[in-house]
Each structure stands twice: as C-alpha cells, then as structure tokens.
A protein has these predicted regions:
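Ligand-binding pockets and gating/stacking loops
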Residues: 1-199
Length: 199
C-alpha cells in the first residue's frame, strides 16, 4: 500500500506539472507582446512560475531516481531581464554594475534577495517527498552560489556559497564558514565531494 501511495503521488505530481505548463502556454499564446522577447517559446513570463516548474521537475527526477545530480542556473549573468516582483525595475546586468552607489547597491540586493527567496519552495518540495525513513531534503546536498563576490568589479574572490540539505547526515547545518583569503572555491567543492564519499 505504501508503494502504491507513493506511485500515485508521483504520477499526480507529474500530471500537475503538465497542467501548469499547459495553463502557462495558453496564457503565453495570447498574441500579446511578451515581457521578455528573448525568452524561448514556452517559458513562462513569470520568473517565479518558471523557477517553481524547474524545481518541480528536478524534485520529480530525484523522486523517480532518474538522476541524482542536476545543475540549474536561475538566470544569465549578462541578462537585461527585470524582476519587478523584487521591488526594483532595474535590469539584472545593469544592476550588477551598480557603481557602488547606495541606490544601485540596494537594487542589486533586492534582485539577489528575490532569487534566494525562491529556494524555500524547492526545499519544502524535497522535504515533502518521503525517502526511506526520512525525506528527500535530508538525503540531498544543494549548493547555491554566485560566480562573483562583487559583480561591480568582476571580482571572483570570496564568492558566496550556501549549502542546504543534510546530505544523508554529512552536513550539520547552522554553520557560517569564512575561508582564509585566497582559498580557491574548488576547495569547497572538493570537500563536498569528499563528504559524499567521492575521492
């Protein structure tokens, strides 16, 4: 009965993602001028809707053990996309080159905060998936980060990383680490692989 319930839930989750995609496609096919002319056909105008669909598909792939690794880039660094839901209408790339002005820094902060605010949706989704005696979030290691620490200067030193999930007990959580200056980000990636038993 437990396996049947799990399979039913998985299939219903797939059907729900399909229904949401169909609703989005119907809205986008209205002939209206799209907010994002460079967006590929079928991608929702709403950033949050797009990210949630991508997270749902990733969670489904994990639940079905189709993959154990994925990479997802939430946006292009050179994009002029705007995120009005963030509280600013400044495009992403121009906001990243804020010139150190108080307004510019605030706009870029609002956009980044908006992006990070998408993560709890994915975490909750993974936490809702039963995985053995625990849940998918407890069995997962998620790395979220930025390729720059100061995009205004194109500075690649001391780039921020957030680790989420428990990696099957390998991540303790509630820890803030500051690596010594000059430490390559590759060291963090290597430590993560070692914690998963990869040499």
């Amino acid at each position: 009965p437990d396996d049947n319930h799990r399979l039913d839930r998985y299939l219903e989750d797939i059907r729900e993602v399909e229904r949401r995609i169909q609703r989005i496609e119907a809205r986008n096919a209205s002939g209206e001028v799209r907010e994002l002319p460079e967006a590929p056909a079928g991608v929702p105008d709403s950033f949050a809707e797009h990210v949630q669909l991508m997270f749902d598909i990733q969670a489904l792939a994990f639940a079905a053990d189709i993959t154990r690794v994925f990479s997802f880039k939430m946006g292009r660094d050179g994009s002029s996309r705007t995120y009005p839901e963030s509280g600013t209408d400044k495009p992403f790339h121009p906001a990243s080159h804020h010139g150190g002005t108080q307004k510019g820094v605030k706009d870029f902060h609002l956009i980044n905060r908006y992006h990070v605010a998408m993560l709890p949706y994915f975490l909750d989704k993974l936490k809702s998936i039963q995985e053995g005696d625990s849940n998918m979030l407890d069995k997962t290691m998620i790395v979220y980060g930025s390729p720059m620490s100061d995009s205004n200067l194109h500075n690649h030193r001391r780039c921020p990383l957030i680790l989420l999930g428990k990696a099957n007990g390998q991540l303790a959580g509630n820890t803030h680490l500051v690596a010594p200056d000059g430490t390559p980000m590759a060291n963090a990636m290597l430590s993560m692989l070692h914690s998963l038993g990869v040499d």
